[in-house]
């Protein structure tokens, strides 16, 4: 029997594509009779929905705030430690871990954003403008955003360099990006494994009243997901929304995670959306707009394509590798390019279904 200490921290606090990956690995491991699973979580982070109750019924769990990773490993005689999103472990003590370790680094988007000065394009508070001033005039300063972000990886980089630690990632793009910024890891054989498909069940019953009304009305809509995350780049769509609505007055824009005011009447803003409702949104959309600045893999386009829903996506990072010629591409920096691709899709819709 192999004892595995499984990372539950990557499933806490918020939903993400990386978290979906980790949950799928967990579900598959539960089916293995030759593996005994223990879980590590952080009591200072929230579990999503009823995850804590579900996990505690299935495995024995340890709080990293009460016991160091190394101590959990020794007490439970762990053979393999699995960390599903290695960046989530930056705050913790990673010393004295001698068992086999499997780590996944999905991307280094925060480094890519700052090293390429994309963070200058984000919306900022007055406080953040002070930081941007430092970035603009003295980017080599230890206080610059570039150097502060890189410094946050210090603990992780040291840990990944150990002989007992194996590193996995989710695309060839992510592998090359990791090696570009962390050249010392070239001695590692980074394994690339594309993420498994999601296994959510789509129910015909809709939980959200707004979504119910949307479907009942039969309105056509563009779908944009996770607008609350800066790297998803809702701003580029927001800039051309008026032109989209003006040219296509019967087209609506459905946005999940929207935390800003949009005055265009054809925008439907949604907060939390259940997994089943999200599947229905993907299935019934006229098209998905995926404008990310950075992606290690990118689940949403795959989710849309499985329902034969066209995708208009940014042409950077992993997108061309993962999506090939199945989608329409645009530059995430040009609102006019996005608008042009929406017009093009409208003219040639049958070719992208």
Residue ranges, per PLM feature:
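Carbohydrate transferase catalytic cores enriched for Leloir-type hexosyltransferases
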Residues: 1-353
